[in-house]
Amino acid sequence: MKLTFLAATGLALLALTVPGRIAAQLAGEPYIHDPSTVIWSDGRYYTFGTGGGGLMSEDGYTWHTGAVRPGGGVAPDVIKLGDRYYVAYAVGGGGMSGGHASNVKIMWTKTLDPKSPDFKFNDVGVVASSDGVEDCDAIDPAFLYVKGHLYLSYGTYFGNIRIVELDPKTGKRIAGNKPVNVAIDMEATDMMYRDGWYYLLGTHGTCCDGANSSYNIRVGRSRSITGPYVDNMGIPLLKGGGKLVVDGRGRVFGPGHFGLLDLGDGVQKFSMHYEADMDRSARSVLDIRPLLWKDGWPVGGDNFQSGTYEIESERSGWALELAVDFVRIETMRRRGPGGPPPGGPPPQPAAGQPGQTPAAAPQGPPPGGFWGPPTGPVTPIPDQTLAQDSAVWPSGNIGVDMYEYMIRPHQKWTITPVPDAGGYPGSPYFKITIAGTDRALAATAESEVVTVPAFTGAPEQLWRIDQLTDGTYRIMPKLVPNIKEPLALTAAGASTPTLAKFDPTSDKGRWNFRKP
């Protein structure tokens, strides 16, 4: 049998030495400022930004221009209700031209596809405003629809953040509804509802200065849509409070303009922009990242980073591995002469002397056993090598199973993005290979998983890795041959991996990635 051994690339080495490195990973041209919540419409994802227009994507990973939004203005948001897409945006304000007088306007269309015959924006009108003198600047609108009610938050550092209620059937302001002040010292707000709590997210810090911007996203919560909103320390948002959700890291600065992207089955993500991506000329760029929940609070997760990992089942704690014969690591395993192992029976009396122990009988653990004192130098035992482990591997396809992680080569997986293979919201597709080889994990037409001798780029060898809201991961092949429904890697038993429909209520389909 012949194995292909691969040298570590610079990217893989970086991923090993800097785990969890945050980077704006989206492909294409994701250049935008103040993006609206990412939304799906007629086969594409869309987001709109300040100044009109926006971005679109077929898979949520590679983005390009082409989205159309009339009206200009700043910091739009979008929501779908029934057969309508409502778009809110602000005209004026924001300190532009030295003023804070602004109007929040709403329009709607039945599709966001500019090539569709149904693409036509219909004006609803002004739903909120500021006169430039009052303690509010009516920009940065954001929608929330919950329990049959449609709400809109808006505002910036110049005064209060406010919430008003709209008619979900028309998008107009409900007659007689008055704005409620809910926060200060933030802008670019958004709202969520979860488990009886309303969450108000806002962007703190400075904006619009590239790598010198200090934008960061913070949150408070309330049992009522109108507040009072407080953070995890009990500080009201009306007094400047806010629990950190995400800030800049690595070579990206100034995250702002949160937008929830709920993909279902325990997968939530959020869109935002970075004020500056230092690997893209410090331009403002779109990013999509996992959203986690901890103790009732949202936390920004990290998109999966390439590297070499143990893949551990949340169900059993056992590791995914090749189903091959176990190769022993040869170390001393016999006890030395003249004494029992620790905890063993005491020495027996010598013949003819009942109840007496010979003076020469050894006491305690003898030298020479692995539990006894060493008789020579203490030296590290090297890990088993790939060549040693693979000597017993068969050729052709090899199945997989799960077992206690024992730092064996057949339990170590290298995971790397596949160029030009597309992706899914926030990330590219990955290949999963046994470390140091090209042997790749693949889905079969029988809804099982095997490893094939070499990665070919076939869709059943491409893997989607989504972080779930509890921090574990869901692993899914891009395609299962002859199967239309999406399936996920699942622990059918403590030691048996398979492919099955993902169950968000079970640990069977949840996995962890640990550095070996």
Regions found by a protein language model. Name each.
Residues G301-R334, G376-S395, I407-E446, R464-A494, ...:
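Extracellular glycan-recognition/adhesion modules and their associated mucin-like linkers
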Residues T17-P19:
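N-terminal signal peptide c-region/cleavage motif recognized by signal peptidases
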Residues T37-V38, V78, F143, M191, ...:
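A structural signal for short hydrophobic beta-strand segments in well-ordered beta-sheet cores
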Residues G248-D262:
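Signature of short aromatic-glycine-proline-rich micro-motifs recurring in repeat-based ectodomains
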Residues I32-P35, G73-A75, A138-D140, M186-T189, ...:
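Conserved positions at the start
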Residues I22-I139, L144-M186, Y193-V246, G264-S306, ...:
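Beta-rich carbohydrate-recognition and catalytic domains
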Residues M332-I381:
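Disordered, low-complexity segments in secreted/periplasmic proteins that are enriched in proline
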Residues M1-T9:
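Bacterial N-terminal signal peptides that target proteins for export
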